[in-house]
Amino acid sequence: MKDIKTYDNKNILVLGLGKSGFAVSELLLKLGANLTLNDKADLDKNEKAQELKAKGVRVIGGYHPVDLLEEEHFDYLVKNPGIPYENPMVKKAEELDIPIITEPEVALSCSDAPYVCITGSNGKTTTVMLTQRILDHHLQKTGHHAYAVGNIGVPISEVVPKATKDDILVVEISSFQLLGVTDIKPKVAAIVDIYNNVHLDYHKTFENYVDAKLNVTRTQNSDDYFIANFDQKDILAKEKEVSPAKMQTFSETDHNADYFIGDEYLESQDEKIMKIADIKLPGVHNLQNSLVAIAIAKLMGADNEDIAAVLSTFTGAKHRLQYVTTLDGRKIYNDSKSTNIEAATVAIPAFKEPEVLIAGGLDRGFTFDDLVPLFKKHVKSIVLYGETKYLLADAARKAGIKEIVIVNTLQEAVPRAYELTEPGDVILFSPACASWDQFRTFEERGDYFVRFVEELKTK
């Protein structure tokens, strides 16, 4: 870890505990900062908060001490990415011109290990996992490692102290995290895709959302690389305006891109890299994710043998077209990460077999007309639950689906979907909606889906 002096003896307020709040607090202590930790939750019995308190951190829980920002001098406010900028502490810090930063920027500023950053509306976690595995396969030959960190669930601050200059950090970075970033310099940055109707409750407008995503490349150097989606022309034009890095592109269909999906192979302008039939992950979107991972991994030193070793064995990230089981000839997949319409549009065409689809969730005020052509082509029957069940049913009727079953809960939906199938079919859980009407997170929703599938085996 670099012994930077940026935060040495500086007064810093960490806003929001959580996983990343705890990790960045520990890192800042190592860097010599004077810390105050604040969370609106009561922290008196919180083990992590008390652990920090024992190390000299001032811990304030149960409320936001807005006046404290005026009464005392703070050099930085480190904000948990999930906390909106409307938060009174954040607003007051802005009024007082206190720099507001996030955990990734703090951690990456002192990383000895080179790092790559991957973001996107859909596909970033799978791409991060593929990239990390390929690079780890490459680095293990010399006794070193690639670490998957960031929005994937492992705070960057947790890994930076142990990662050496010969390791590589593969960082999944979200729009929430990027919004607060002012200066990161990944060796390679990538935007897998950008879609509308994603996190607009946080960013307010699509333009704000795109601007946040572009922070992944905005402060790169001219000898760094940026991987861009050749098929999203409007976004590509903005990326070309903003990015100072050397650009490489990938495409599903256009063979003018640097990396593309050929008839039988994943290809670059220079070579055929890997036979598509040998890749375990289902769906065209996962071939695109694979192209991004390949582009990054090659720039960081991996070869085709490293790539083949991973792509021929990796079966997917949890909750992302995750294969669950085969039950009486029916393959069952958990795609709970499908929290928006765009995610469902890549999951539904992923299979050649007839599909019974389970969908539904939080109503964000959208129609589902964009799914009608896919319903018509791929879905033989559909089971719907949650706040959006009737809106989805309208789209299913427009598609001419004859068997439309409406239930109240996911627990009811799973056995009903099984009843509609026959051997050779696929049961696909791809909600096309956020989980918050009935579940706390998409992970919790996916775990319950798997549990309900297991219950089918006992009936």
Swiss-Prot record:
Pathway: Cell wall biogenesis; peptidoglycan biosynthesis. Its EC number is 6.3.2.9. One of its GO terms (cellular component) is cytoplasm. ATP binds at G120, S121, N122, G123, K124, T125, T126. Keywords: ATP-binding, Cell cycle, Cell division, Cell shape, Cell wall biogenesis/degradation, Cytoplasm, Ligase, Nucleotide-binding, Peptidoglycan synthesis. One of its GO terms (molecular function) is UDP-N-acetylmuramoylalanine-D-glutamate ligase activity. It catalyses: UDP-N-acetyl-alpha-D-muramoyl-L-alanine + D-glutamate + ATP = UDP-N-acetyl-alpha-D-muramoyl-L-alanyl-D-glutamate + ADP + phosphate + H(+). Pfam families: Mur_ligase_C (PF02875), Mur_ligase_M (PF08245), MurD-like_N (PF21799). GO terms for biological process: cell division; cell wall organization; peptidoglycan biosynthetic process; regulation of cell shape. InterPro entries: Mur-like_cat_sf, Mur_ligase_C, Mur_ligase_C_dom_sf, Mur_ligase_cen, MurD. It comes from the Bacteria. It is found in: Cytoplasm. Cell wall formation. Catalyzes the addition of glutamate to the nucleotide precursor UDP-N-acetylmuramoyl-L-alanine (UMA). NCBIfam families: murD. Belongs to the MurCDEF family. HAMAP family: MurD. This is UDP-N-acetylmuramoylalanine--D-glutamate ligase.
